[in-house]
Each structure stands twice: as C-alpha cells, then as structure tokens.
Swiss-Prot record:
Biased amino acid composition, Basic and acidic residues: 113-127
GO molecular function: DNA-binding transcription factor activity, RNA polymerase II-specific; RNA polymerase II cis-regulatory region sequence-specific DNA binding; zinc ion binding
UniProt protein name: Zinc finger protein 689
Known role: May be involved in transcriptional regulation.
One Gene Ontology term from the biological process aspect of the record: skeletal muscle cell differentiation
Protein family according to the UniProt entry: Belongs to the krueppel C2H2-type zinc-finger protein family.
Record's keyword terms, sorted: DNA-binding, Isopeptide bond, Metal-binding, Nucleus, Repeat, Transcription, Transcription regulation, Ubl conjugation, Zinc, Zinc-finger
Protease listed as a keyword: no
Main location: nucleus
SUPFAM superfamilies for this protein: beta-beta-alpha zinc fingers (SSF57667), KRAB domain (Kruppel-associated box) (SSF109640)
Region (Disordered): 1-25, 90-146
Amino acid sequence: MAPPSAPLPAQGPGKARPSRKRGRRPRALKFVDVAVYFSPEEWGCLRPAQRALYRDVMRETYGHLGALGCAGPKPALISWLERNTDDWEPAALDPQEYPRGLTVQRKSRTRKKNGEKEVFPPKEAPRKGKRGRRPSKPRLIPRQTSGGPICPDCGCTFPDHQALESHKCAQNLKKPYPCPDCGRRFSYPSLLVSHRRAHSGECPYVCDQCGKRFSQRKNLSQHQVIHTGEKPYHCPDCGRCFRRSRSLANHRTTHTGEKPHQCPSCGRRFAYPSLLAIHQRTHTGEKPYTCLECNRRFRQRTALVIHQRIHTGEKPYPCPDCERRFSSSSRLVSHRRVHSGERPYACEHCEARFSQRSTLLQHQLLHTGEKPYPCPDCGRAFRRSGSLAIHRSTHTEEKLHACDDCGRRFAYPSLLASHRRVHSGERPYACDLCSKRFAQWSHLAQHQLLHTGEKPFPCLECGRCFRQRWSLAVHKCSPKAPNCSPRSAIGGSSQRGNAH
C-alpha cells in the first residue's frame, strides 16, 4: 500500500488556481507553515534518537495547533509519523517546495505496482511562456565542500556566501522563535524555553542520587548513567562500550579515519561539523560560555563544566590505584601513567619520552631554542608563562603583598603564599609513590623524575640527558666536556661558565 502523500487542493482539470491578491487579510496558521520536512537523503542522515525527537516535536506542534483550532484535517505527515516506521515515505516531502506532479506521479507508480488502477494521472509541469503555476525548484541539500563559508548553526558548508545567506533565510522561516538574549532561533516554543535556561541558570531537574541539578531532562538521564554504570552503546568494530550515542559516533571515526569537514582557515580536517564549528572559534576568538562565578569565558561547554568544579570542589573521577580524585577524566588518565610508568609521547629529536603531551612540548623548546613568552617591559623572552610571570614582578615597583613574619614583600599573592610555607613548614604537595611531601609543586615535579627515570634536559652537543636544568648547566661548564659549549646551556648556564 502506498504511503499517503501531501494533501492536494481539489480543482477541476484545466482550471488555473486563482492568483493571490495583495492587501488580503492574513490567513490562519496551518500545520504546513510550521512543519519541518525531509528529503530521502536528509532522512537517511538522521540517527534513531534524532528521528524519535522529530516525531515527538511534530506531534506536539500538531497538538498545539489543535488546541488553537488551526489543526484542520490530519496531514499525511502526522499519519506517517504515528506509524513509527523508519522507512522514508513521500509524506515527508514539503508540498510547497516540490512540484505537485512529483508526489502524484510517485503515488500512481506505487499503485501500479500493487495492481491498482491509475486514479490520478501525472500532470505535466507548465512549460515556460504559458500561464499557470511555475514548478518550484527541488530542495537543495548543502554540500560539504571544502573552503566555503560555514553555517554557524548547523555546520553545513556552502560554495559561496550567497548560498549561505539563502540557507539562513530558509532557516529563519523554519525557526520563527528567536532568543532575546543571544539571537539563536528555534522551531518551537518548547525548545526556546529549554534553551533560555542556559542564560537564566535555572535547573529544575534534580538527581535523586547526588542532588546535582540540570536544566534539561535529557542531561539528567545521561548523568544518571554514571551512578548505574550502564554503557548501552557498543562499538561493533572493537566492542568498546560508551554511555552516550554521540561518544560512540565520535569513537567510530577512529576506525574509518574519515574526516570530510575541512577548516577554510588552516586546512585542518574533522569528522563532524560540530567539531569543525568548535575549532573555528580558535580563529574567530569567540568564547560563548561564561562562568557565572568569575566571569571567565570558554570556547567549549565541556571546558566550562570542568572549570566550574574549581568553585564547587567536585572531583568525580577517583584513581583506583591511590586515593586521589580529579575533576576531569583526562587528568585522571594522565595521572594513572604515574602508576603504570607509561610514557607515550616521544621526542623526535632525542630518545626522551614523556607521560604528558604538555611536558613534551616544553621539552621540544630546548631543541628549537624558541622562547614564546617575551617580557613587554624589557624584551627578555622565556620558555614558560610561569617564568615570565615571576620575572615581571622584578619590574613592578609596588609590592603590595608583605609577609607578616619577615616583612618581605611580593608582587603577587601566589608568590607570598609560596613564601609563607617557609615559615609555617606546610608541605601540601605529596608524592603518590613514596609519600614524601614538598612545599612547592615544582619541587614535587623534580622529585617524581626519580621514580619515572625521566631526564628532560638533553645536551645538544653530546646527547647526554639530565633530570635538572642546573645539572645540565654544570655539565656544559665541565672541563670533561670540552666540545659542549657553555653558550648553549639552559637558563643562566653561560653566566656560570664565565664565573668559572
């Protein structure tokens, strides 16, 4: 049996539709004015969860129109959605965007297959030059071309800016409800109400296990999986399980390696339009997510969530090997390499290996000689931002933060706090492997090199590696290493060589 097609106006053969006259009173809102339609290609790109959401929203919209007395006869689209089938049918076509003969022709072909008589013969589209209804153009599916402008809402790429503007106009017609705070548009009032909670901070959905609150019900459902430990989404390639379907979709790109979406600014490629849209914020400088506690802004929502745990003190990721807890899963993964001894990041210039990528990047500056942090006051450059911050305190005449015990003054509260541990004897940084404690984090980092065996400071002349910077400087000035020039020493090693 053929699926129902979009309703057609009843009129006699050969009669032209009466032309619309200007100045008429606006007609009542119909379901076809607010409904969203899909072509076969677009329907095939939707995931099962997206199709279920589409069914719910369309039914809710039709119910709202019925309450207002504007529903009219049941559309073929609603009848198709009520059958809960995943197969695309012509009822999903927009009757205002496709020629009338297209839908009727498909219906007649389907009836021919079933052995029925052809009730509605297909009509030919009116030719150019004759009066009558002009056949509308078929819907264009945005191509994922590289190098063209990208829609910030859906992530689709277009060949030129004119096509992008046409796409935006069509989206505005389908999304008539704008947010007064940020201007983002939505198709239905319920979606707008849910979105506005992001601005107001309202969180009406509460977890009955831990009391955490959420602005949307689906976020609460995703959170509750953490308590149950359930991971219902399995990868068919490697068997790995995930809590969210989106995480599984992102993981499967590691097997296929497909990255069809290219950044027009730097050429980097991504597997999904959403990842490309997030990446492009590094070029535009956009940071749409703001912390309500300290007004700090972030490019990604996940970065904001991790940052907010600094204010709440929440650390939901415990280490199974020790008692330490972490605010993000990435920090837990990085910490567990201390127990396993894994060092997956290797230097391409020497044989040094590192457990963290940030440590590798800092180490590679030793080979390149790059110092990306210059002092704006004197021009002196540094390899680390922390070293620059400490150096800039030497230019500051006002040192407002004084030590109560010895009267020494400091330019920053962090330097004063680190200094006061000398008087109090406090050692808040403990080694995970031997429980030895230190007053400063840098001292703990140097100590942990004894356990890992890591030697991040290589001599560029002879290739010998050292655990500490000053050990390399002493080696440069040693008479036993005549080929190692003191000028290439790290930090102030050249000055030490001249002193000797």
